[in-house]
Amino acid sequence: MCASFSPTLDSRSRQLLRTLISCYIQNGEPIGSKTLAQQAGLDISPATIRNILADLEELGLLNSPHTSAGRVPTAHGYRMFVDSLVQMQPPSEDDIRRLRVEMTGGGTQTLLGSASEILSAMTHFVGVVSAPRREQFVFRHIDFVPLDARQIMAILIFADNEVQNRVIEPRRVYEPGELERVSNYLNAHFIGRTLADIRTTVLCELRKAKDEMEQLLAHSLDLASQMLVPNDSEDIVVTGQTRLMALQDLSDMDRLRELFEIFASKREILQLLERTIDAPGVRIFIGEETGMVSMEDISLVTAPYAAHGQVLGVLGVIGPKRMAYDRVIPLVQVVAQVLGTALEPPTMP
């Protein structure tokens, strides 16, 4: 999670804050002292409750809308809630079994799409999943196809049956027979290894003097070094954007338009997800913690997903600050675990 905001509160204040935020998340209306007296389970007078609420407001945890006598949580209030007050409601065993069934079979892209759709459908918000870098996947086969005198298409097939085409411009002209021998050499020596591992080996070998290498090896390493340039145009799967239009919390059309532009470009969402890829467990960005003005009314709950102990990407849920964190946080955790397991055979070593 992001930096916590945890002023010291006594047990009554914590209970009232927890109850107020839980009630507000549920019904979206400012919460008054009478409602809290009924819901909090504390044997204290409404006057005492009002005094405690005033103290919580002074601490910046609550706010009083001008049109209501009740109070609503601030971003700091939500932060304290998710850091130390929320009581998680994880998915049931039946739900987890259904998730595993829905994310069984299919290629990597299909699984990513399924994960994003599940997150959106089960929360009624936006589901996002960053795609793994192809360099992290196991290489199974390569073919070279000449396009013209100067360009060659490298066709890479991975262990998860995904195919990637890369166009390269070699330093010399290769005859079809040479390309076949080079592909045979690379297939014989590098099958079963990741592109990142292959790149390290190739660059190491290229440092050796050219006259120390066989001609076939030299040509193979030359083509491989060009083919294995890292691909930075990683993708992201976004599902359920239109669900946000029905939320009363996001009724500002100008702000909503900006948000949809972010979804369309994907770049800023991907950058936000990448900030969490090296952090274990769930991370939560509330409002301005995202670093984007257009998302100051938004929360993002993320978790990395991994296969065979290697982190591949990040998934999460984007929704209003007034979201059911008690359900969304454990759901994101579970979907990340299920997706990672589904990607293990046979996509990773």
Curated annotation (Swiss-Prot):
Pfam families given in the database record: HrcA, HrcA_DNA-bdg
GO MF, one example: DNA binding
Xref: Gene3D superfamilies: 3.30.450.40, Heat-inducible transcription repressor hrca homolog, domain 3 (3.30.390.60), Winged helix-like DNA-binding domain superfamily/Winged helix DNA-binding domain (1.10.10.10)
Keyword vocabulary terms for this entry: Repressor, Stress response, Transcription, Transcription regulation
Disulfide bonds: none
Entry's Gene Ontology BP terms: negative regulation of DNA-templated transcription
Family: Belongs to the HrcA family.
Function, in words: Negative regulator of class I heat shock genes (grpE-dnaK-dnaJ and groELS operons). Prevents heat-shock induction of these operons.
Protein name listed in UniProt: Heat-inducible transcription repressor HrcA
Organism expressing this protein natively: Xylella fastidiosa (strain Temecula1 / ATCC 700964)
Species classification: Bacteria, Pseudomonadati, Pseudomonadota, Gammaproteobacteria, Lysobacterales
